[in-house]
Amino acid sequence: MAKDTSYDAVMDRRAEIMSRALGLNYDEFIISDIAFDYEGMMAKAGYSLEEVRQIQSESGVGNTPLLELRNITDLARKTSKRGFGARILIKDEAANPSGSFKDRRASVSIHHAKKLGYPGVLAATSGNYGAAVASQAAMKNLGCIIVQEVFDSRHVGQPEIIEKSRKCEAYGAEVVQLTVGPELFYVSLILLEETGYFNASLYSPFGISGVETLGYELVEQIRARYDKDPAYIVVTHAGGGNVTGTARGALKAGAKNSTIIGASVDLSGLHMASDNDFNKKSFTTGHTGFGVPFATWPDRTDVPKNAARPLRYLDRYVTVTQGEVFYVTEALAQVEGMERGPAGNTSLAAAIALARELPEDEIVVVQETEYTGAGKHPWAQLDFAKQNGIAVKRGAPKENKPGKTIVIPQNFSQITATEMDLNRMRRSYIRNALERNKVKNVTEEDIRFLAEDTKTDADFVTSVIRDLGVRL
């Protein structure tokens, strides 16, 4: 008898489908409605750092170059007060097989799928991760399906996303293209059930453990060359896996005093699931449309408990404008001779501003570059923005209005980073944890977990809970 594939029926079966597609029983880590054993989940489901390094070495992933951006550092110093302007370094993750750090994330999932005997892998993604999964699956001779949100209801798609679809197909993947909306998860569940494929989720412990090598490597490389740890590690932040994995790796390397700073493109006011807003943004990842909601409620993904938990690790969170990232993309190419895409250049734009805060003998490291899709060339995305009624001009970045105006800076001194209120986001996360789980009474175990999950303490959590009127 054929299974009921109506939306409600598939959603009712999602726990069963996900358990089979990951080979992981999340129930054993649950402590309460709020708390779960995060480190226990990472230890049991993931691989050790040395095991991951071996897995990645076998598939050509990792050990990417660490480059000093001397010319960009000089420009940052010229726009800093005397004696300030930290050295800016960048981890050239574009050297990975598919052109981004996502190869690290995909490598462990695909290795695990092969080890467990799955016939293939599936990933729901807008771009870079799909290319990484397809590339790694090709190496392991596994089937691969990539499910992408590509179009709005007019069937119009952004150049960057369409180019990344082509890249996935070039690696031999079957690409299922969807319009924006709630069907992404639904279609993914149906395909997982039909094919028996492994869910190469961005948010599983396998994916996050794959990124830990990035944080570990960059600390090792900086110590070997400069005999010190970086003052700031700047990470492009979207769904939280980049921040989580990089920070965990840096901590495992012993870099306890390095400040972890997330950076996102400011797309405030645009709704990521809105058909109307879908093509009004010029960035498909690394923006606040993912960065804020995934930080304030990480368990909104295709796994029961998200291994990407950015508030556990973020010390600061800043935003830059679309125009600033486009400007820095051009600067990196013309000043440093490196043509790279917007994901890494988001954190580079922030790093330029952040470097001005520190003395010249300190180090700011940007932990990724990427080289995939049309997004590495600003003109395709800017032309597309104009076609969708967005004004593009030169001027002051503060004039940027997401969905209306993209303002390209006129000079280097105009690049700034806007601080986000992390405590406000932490309070929002705690409220979501209580309300979404319908919690009426909070236990000491819940308070301990929430303090760890927000990088705060019991007093902070207790104060927020009392403000919400929940019984302790």
UniProtKB/Swiss-Prot annotation:
Molecular function, one GO term: acetyl-CoA C-acetyltransferase activity
Enzyme nomenclature, EC number: 2.3.1.263
Residues that hold pyridoxal 5'-phosphate according to the record: 128, 238-242
Modification N6-(pyridoxal phosphate)lysine, positions: 102
Disulfide links within the chain: none
InterPro entries listed in its UniProt record: AKP_thiolase_beta, Cys_Synth/Cystath_Beta-Synth, TrpB-like_PALP, TrpB-like_PALP_sf
Coiled coil: none
Taxonomy, superkingdom: Bacteria
Keywords: Pyridoxal phosphate, Transferase
GO BP: any one term: ornithine metabolic process
Cofactors that this protein relies on: pyridoxal 5'-phosphate
Reactions it catalyzes: D-alanine + acetyl-CoA = (2R)-2-amino-4-oxopentanoate + CoA
Protein purpose: Involved in the ornithine fermentation pathway. Catalyzes the thiolytic cleavage of 2-amino-4-ketopentanoate (AKP) with coenzyme A (CoA) to form acetyl-CoA and alanine. It is strictly specific for AKP.
Homology family: Belongs to the threonine synthase family.
Subunit structure: Heterodimer with OrtA.
Protein name: 2-amino-4-ketopentanoate thiolase beta subunit
Lineage: Bacteria, environmental samples
Gene name of the record: ortB
